[in-house]
């Protein structure tokens, strides 16, 4: 009777485990065979001729995505080329160069910090930093997500840019100044956090270049496609 009860109980347990997708393996506890292994997909690499690269001079207050449930301005309002996606981020409240492509591997190499694509920003800050302040940024500053890598930083005269809409909010009794900051990292809102860390909040941020590509000659809100020769040079730069 005891043996029969044990067999019945064991049978019920196996039936329960089978229904749940679990079978015991030798010497180990039950394993769940319903779990599927999802291999990490490699970014899609296209040939030179198949690749499209778009340079876009992003206006202020535009999201770097093509849809938005809240009805805010997106890339769809400016770019009519299908199946291209942004290489890296550019915050809604930032302006300037955004690169888009249909080549997944190119997108990955432009955005991933390990490929060290240098990005140049013109940054209007509140106040006038001294050389000792800039030296902190060059060396690296401690942010919540770690110490930043060394940056190239210098004071510049006010650049000849388009008017921002809406204009920045300036305090009349506090002067502003412009910095040129070059970094190869891509942390969230990194430049803004860097300038705030040394006591000079960012008022306006414009990305002017990524690697060899820049917004020179590109009006704010407009885009252009790279030529085949330009794409070839870009492939060589990122070692594709």
UniProtKB/Swiss-Prot annotation:
Its EC number is 5.4.99.20. Disulfide bonds: none annotated. Pfam families: PseudoU_synth_2. GO terms for biological process: pseudouridine synthesis; rRNA processing. It comes from the Bacteria. Transmembrane segments: none annotated. The active site is at 91 (nucleophile). The keyword rRNA processing applies. It is an enzyme of class 5 (isomerase). It catalyses: uridine(2457) in 23S rRNA = pseudouridine(2457) in 23S rRNA. One of its GO terms (molecular function) is RNA binding. Keywords: Isomerase, rRNA processing. InterPro entries: PsdUridine_s_RsuA/RluB/E/F_cat (IPR042092), PsdUridine_synth_cat_dom_sf (IPR020103), PsdUridine_synth_RsuA/RluA (IPR006145), PsdUridine_synth_RsuA/RluB/E/F (IPR000748), PsdUridine_synth_RsuA/RluB_CS (IPR018496), RsuA_PseudoU_synthase (IPR050343), TruA/RsuA/RluB/E/F_N (IPR020094). Responsible for synthesis of pseudouridine from uracil-2457 in 23S ribosomal RNA. Belongs to the pseudouridine synthase RsuA family. This is Ribosomal large subunit pseudouridine synthase E. It comes from Haemophilus influenzae (strain ATCC 51907 / DSM 11121 / KW20 / Rd). The gene is rluE.
């Amino acid at each position: 009777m005891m043996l029969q009860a044990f067999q019945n109980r064991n049978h019920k347990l196996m039936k329960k485990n089978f229904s749940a997708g679990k079978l015991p393996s030798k010497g180990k506890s039950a394993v769940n065979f319903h779990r599927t292994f999802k291999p990490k997909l490699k970014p899609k690499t296209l040939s030179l001729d198949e690749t499209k690269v778009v340079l876009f001079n992003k206006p202020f207050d535009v999201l770097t995505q093509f849809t938005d449930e809240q009805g805010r301005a997106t890339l769809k309002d400016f770019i009519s080329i299908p199946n291209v996606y942004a290489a890296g981020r550019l915050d809604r409240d930032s302006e300037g160069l955004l690169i888009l492509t249909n080549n997944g591997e190119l997108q990955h190499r432009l955005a991933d910090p390990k490929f060290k694509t240098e990005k140049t920003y013109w940054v209007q800050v509140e106040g006038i930093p001294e050389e000792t302040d800039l030296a902190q940024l060059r060396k690296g500053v401690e942010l919540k997500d770690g110490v930043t890598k060394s940056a190239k930083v210098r004071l510049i005269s006010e650049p000849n840019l388009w008017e921002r809409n809406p204009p920045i909010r300036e305090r009349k009794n506090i002067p502003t100044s412009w910095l040129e900051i070059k970094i190869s990292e891509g942390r969230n809102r990194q430049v803004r956090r860097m300038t705030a860390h040394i006591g000079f909040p960012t008022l306006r941020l414009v990305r002017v270049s990524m690697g060899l590509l820049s917004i020179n000659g590109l009006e704010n809100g407009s885009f252009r496609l790279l030529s085949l020769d330009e794409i070839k040079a870009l492939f060589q730069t990122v070692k594709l």
